[in-house]
């Protein structure tokens, strides 16, 4: 059985002066080597959840537990932040070094890590995100996707238990989004890194292992991407869309082209269409 890395139990939070709760009785767990996506329209509670996980706010009720032992509180917030690494929305706002290597080692320098160990962590982190060839590059020479991969490397160098992506692809072009999503998938499948992605990008969510839908501060549904995106009517009712490949597959089925699988990527859909065509 996989180790539980993060446990959210019955958390609720209400902003001062607000008439309703931003989050109400939310519970879920995140396990080692798992990639979970949280989706929902604006006002669903996604941003509030990110702030709670980072310790910017504390829940009014319920608990947040990391590694089965550490409960988030005013006393433990700094220890929890060492275990949870966050990558945010704007890649330019996260780049603090004059070169890629300066940026990645920034956090390591702040904790006084010995130089030899720092160099080892730097090399490992850049290899994980496939940016080792850009060691001395300046930020202005990098694409948005490359900057986010460097931001991920900076977090990984600190070796947190959990990587949280807070709308980390929302300001990127399609190529940049693909780069980051491919990097995250490799980190999960090849290195067993645990990832929580808070996103409005359904193409990104479709690549994760599990999807949780937040709606008006509560969990509406939870399951595999295949299960979630089959319910296109439910998603549309709460203001969400479905991945483009799912839309195309539904149109094909209406035209009596019988597909065997749920397709979350265009590549998967094209492959099945090719197989069907080859049988004719």
From Swiss-Prot:
Superkingdom of the source species: Bacteria
Entries under SUPFAM superfamilies matching the protein: P-loop containing nucleoside triphosphate hydrolases
GO molecular function: ATP binding; ATP hydrolysis activity; ATPase-coupled transmembrane transporter activity
Keywords associated with the record: ATP-binding, Cell membrane, Membrane, Nucleotide-binding, Translocase, Transport
Keyword ATP-binding appears in the UniProt entry: yes
Amino acids binding ATP: 40-47
EC assignment: 7.-.-.-
Pfam families hit by this protein: ABC_tran
ABC transporter domain location: 6-241
Coiled-coil stretches: none
Subunit structure as annotated in this protein's UniProt entry: Forms a stable energy-coupling factor (ECF) transporter complex composed of 2 membrane-embedded substrate-binding proteins (S component), 2 ATP-binding proteins (A component) and 2 transmembrane proteins (T component).
Family statement: Belongs to the ABC transporter superfamily. Energy-coupling factor EcfA family.
Name of the protein this chain belongs to: Energy-coupling factor transporter ATP-binding protein EcfA1
Protein source organism: Bacillus cereus (strain ATCC 14579 / DSM 31 / CCUG 7414 / JCM 2152 / NBRC 15305 / NCIMB 9373 / NCTC 2599 / NRRL B-3711)
């Amino acid at each position: 059985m996989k180790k539980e890395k993060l446990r959210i139990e019955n958390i609720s939070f209400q902003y001062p002066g607000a008439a309703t709760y931003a989050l109400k009785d939310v519970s879920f767990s995140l396990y080692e080597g798992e990639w979970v996506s949280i989706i929902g329209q604006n006002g669903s509670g996604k941003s509030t959840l990110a702030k709670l996980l980072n310790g910017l706010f504390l829940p009014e009720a319920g608990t947040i537990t990391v590694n089965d032992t550490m409960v988030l509180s005013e006393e433990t917030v700094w220890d929890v932040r060492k275990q949870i690494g966050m990558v945010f929305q704007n890649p330019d706002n996260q780049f603090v070094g004059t070169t890629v290597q300066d940026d990645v080692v920034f956090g390591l320098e702040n904790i006084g890590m010995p130089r030899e160990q720092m160099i080892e962590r730097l090399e490992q982190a850049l290899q994980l995100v496939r940016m080792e060839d850009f060691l001395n590059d300046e930020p202005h020479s990098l694409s948005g996707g490359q900057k986010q991969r460097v931001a991920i490397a900076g977090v990984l160098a600190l070796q947190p238990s959990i990587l949280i992506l807070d709308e980390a692809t929302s300001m990127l072009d399609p190529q940049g989004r693909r780069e980051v999503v491919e990097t995250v998938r490799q980190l999960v499948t090849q290195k067993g890194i645990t990832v929580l992605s808070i996103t409005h990008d359904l193409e990104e969510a479709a690549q994760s292992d599990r999807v949780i839908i937040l709606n008006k501060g509560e969990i509406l549904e939870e399951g595999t991407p295949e299960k979630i995106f089959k319910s296109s009517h439910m998603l549309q009712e709460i203001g969400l869309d479905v991945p483009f490949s799912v839309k195309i597959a539904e149109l094909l089925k209406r035209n009596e082209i019988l597909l065997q699988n749920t397709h979350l990527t265009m590549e998967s859909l094209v492959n099945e269409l090719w197989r069907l065509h080859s049988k004719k």
